[in-house]
């Protein structure tokens, strides 16, 4: 726990030279919450560092931002934010992906990562106006290209194949074909952790650049 706090203190020192005092002030309750969850052994430092850097990016763009927020039955999102826009409020949900693959999936890491990403998009995007994934620049998200298309342009047969693949990994809660047909991925936030830099990319642009 002491090491967790020390790492976050160092991160805040780095951030203080890159963002405004207003952003730093808004990050304090996020820091407090993550330290509390670390006391309970519910979060890990590599994941929390990315949450804070991404939160600083969202806050600087006008979002009131929370971390590790309950969203529904047995669901918790990594980052949630809302801001005023011309037509009302805009809600964003961001999920952090570090690239972790469990030992039991050592022989099929790509399939595991692809179905994990698919599950995240299908399950979480329904709770937001804008849904994004964030990942470090040294990891490549395995985003199915079909999910970067608008719902009307998605091939039903391709989605059915993706659903079948997902069922082998995620059965509780299950993913439906309807969710795959209507879900949305609106942005990818690429994080350079060492210098606390965030670059927002369109999902199609991300796939073209990294895959």
Regions found by a protein language model. Give the residues of each.
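Catalytic cores of nucleic-acid endonucleases
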Residues: 97-155
């Amino acid at each position: 726990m002491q090491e967790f706090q020390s790492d976050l203190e160092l991160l805040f020192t780095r951030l203080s030279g890159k963002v405004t005092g207003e952003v730093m002030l808004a990050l304090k309750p996020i820091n407090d919450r993550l330290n509390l969850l670390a006391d309970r052994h519910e979060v890990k430092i590599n994941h929390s560092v990315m949450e804070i850097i991404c939160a600083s990016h969202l806050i600087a763009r006008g979002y009131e931002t929370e971390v590790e927020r309950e969203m529904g039955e047995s669901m918790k999102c990594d980052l949630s934010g809302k801001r005023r826009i011309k037509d009302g409020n805009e809600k964003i949900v961001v999920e952090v992906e570090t690239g972790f693959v469990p030992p039991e999936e050592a022989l099929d890491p790509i399939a595991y990562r692809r179905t994990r990403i698919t599950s995240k998009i299908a399950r979480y995007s329904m709770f937001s106006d804008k849904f994004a994934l964030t990942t470090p620049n040294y990891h490549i998200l395995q985003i199915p290209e079909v999910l970067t298309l608008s719902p009307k342009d998605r091939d039903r047969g391709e989605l059915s194949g993706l659903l079948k693949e997902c069922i082998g990994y995620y059965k509780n809660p299950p993913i439906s074909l309807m969710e795959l047909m209507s879900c949305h991925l609106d942005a990818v936030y690429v994080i350079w952790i060492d210098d606390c830099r965030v670059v927002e990319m369109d999902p199609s642009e991300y796939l073209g650049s990294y895959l």
